[in-house]
Design a protein with these regions (language model features):
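Bacterial N-terminal signal peptides
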Residues: 9-20
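Short, flexible, surface-exposed loop segments at domain boundaries
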Residues: 2-4, 18, 22-123, 130-412, ...
Length: 450
């Protein structure tokens, strides 16, 4: 008993010390190499399916990114972040931590450290594993591990993992509805979808190969958080497993039949078999249209820890809604009956609503203390992106960068704080916010000099 108490005290002290030492934003990853196997300490081993969702943890899913010589893809980057010194004070003077192995999963909403689901993480000492892109950018989905404050506003990332969620040709499109289809998956968009190299969906020709980051919604549907056009590249598909046939070694993801007979399964499947309802990401070495997709890798999508007492924050779309006390986000059962709800009226909760939730796991259920509505079908919702850092590559208020992200702050309605547009220039310390990224450029709505 004495040893257990001592161990708990040391763990809490270590986590608090990490937060107290925070302060500056992290840099991006550089270099090449394969992705590191992923299995965060403190998460459940195996890949649990809690009545249709993804549980468990311990991805460990091989090195089969598409950056190998055989595929010529973007590859992956695994590195320790280097401090950029953004003077953010992230984690300093914090209100305490829940657990040292807290997990956040969602789309990146800001840079300077990084912001995921409104929680700002210091990434100075984080291990970064980024696949399918050269660096982490706004709109990419990610899983962040590390201690957080009790109010879920700041944290210290120890590990950041990010991969693309869908890649393939756009085979059909409904621009009026803001949706398209890739590999049998219906991709929906909203005001917060980042368009990396196009003004919007209407500007992308049918048949274009797209790389999409997004959060799984109902089976066969992905809510896009970032869309990029790509040259021909091998497929990636993310979705909920249905129609699993362990004899034929096939299952479906939306309208796509997947053959996994020759695939490498992520280490998480060693303890808990692949099952219907699991959310997975699959990769193939070659594309085959039409017909089943033969994949080379099947791995759990960013796994959610199921251990009681672990702090978890998720950004995703509500499914299986049965009331505020029972619904799912990213396959995880959520109880928001006692949550503080912001961003819209509580009566707006329901299937298809995009939310951010934060709380503590208890017997496989995420008991949330905070819930923010981000998008309500037919109504919309708040979209906000944030950059914290110094101005670089300044040409004019219409063309500069912060944290490598292009910014346009030339609009007549841009609000400046602690200065004016005349104070913009390379080296200026700023916080920039806006609600749209079009053609890869953040359209600034507010610039505050720091």
């Amino acid at each position: 008993m004495t040893l257990k108490i001592l161990r708990s005290s040391l763990l809490a002290f270590s986590a608090a010390l990490l937060l107290a030492c925070g302060g500056g934003g992290g840099g991006g990853g550089g270099g090449g190499g394969g992705s590191a196997a992923f299995g965060a300490a403190g998460t459940a081993s195996g890949f649990g399916v809690n009545g249709g969702g993804s549980g468990g943890a311990g991805d460990g899913g091989g090195n089969a990114g598409d950056g190998s010589a055989s595929t010529g893809g973007a590859g992956s980057t695994t590195t320790a972040a280097t401090g950029g010194g953004d003077d953010s004070g992230v984690g300093s003077g914090g209100t305490g931590v829940s657990t040292a192995d807290a997990v956040g999963i969602g789309a990146v909403g800001g840079l300077g450290s990084i912001i995921v689901n409104g929680l700002r993480y210091n990434t100075d000492s984080a291990s970064l594993s980024i696949e399918d892109a050269a660096a982490l950018q706004i709109g990419m989905t990610a899983r962040v591990t590390g201690p957080v404050s009790l109010d879920f506003t700041t944290g210290v990332a120890t590990q950041v993992v990010s991969s693309a969620d869908l890649r393939g040709p756009m085979l059909s499109v409904d621009t009026a509805a803001g949706r398209f289809v890739v590999w049998g998956t219906t991709v929906t968009t909203d005001a917060a979808t980042v368009w990396a190299d196009a003004p919007g969906l209407a500007a992308i020709p049918l048949g274009t190969t797209l790389q999409v980051w997004g959060v799984p919604a109902e089976p066969g549907v992905l809510r896009a958080t970032r869309v990029e056009q790509r040259a021909l590249a091998v497929p990636i598909v993310t979705g909920t497993v249905q129609n699993l046939n362990t004899t034929l070694r096939t299952f479906t993801l939306g309208g796509l039949t997947v053959n996994y007979g020759l695939a490498v399964l992520g280490n998480a499947f060693d303890s808990t078999p692949l099952a219907n309802g699991a959310i997975v990401r699959v990769r193939a070495d070659v594309a085959a249209l039409p017909g089943p997709l033969t994949v080379s890798l099947v791995q759990p999508w960013y796994p959610v820890p199921a251990i009681t007492g672990v702090a978890v924050q998720l950004g995703g779309v509500i499914t299986d809604y049965a009331g505020s006390g029972s619904f799912r986000v990213l396959g995880t059962t959520v109880d928001a009956s006692s949550a503080q709800i912001t961003g819209g009226p509580p009566g707006s909760l329901g299937d298809g609503v995009k939310v951010e939730v934060a709380g503590i796991m208890a017997n496989g259920v995420l008991k949330v203390s905070k819930l923010k509505l981000r998008n309500i079908p037919g109504t919309g919702g708040p979209a906000a992106f944030t950059l914290i850092g110094t101005v670089g590559n300044f040409v004019s208020p219409a063309s500069f960068q912060v944290r490598g992200q292009p910014v346009d702050a030339s609009g007549a309605s841009v609000v400046f704080g602690n200065g004016t547009a005349a104070n913009l220039g390379s080296g200026a310390a700023v916080t920039v916010s806006g609600s749209q990224i079009v053609n890869g450029t953040l359209i600034a709505e507010q610039v505050v000099f720091r």
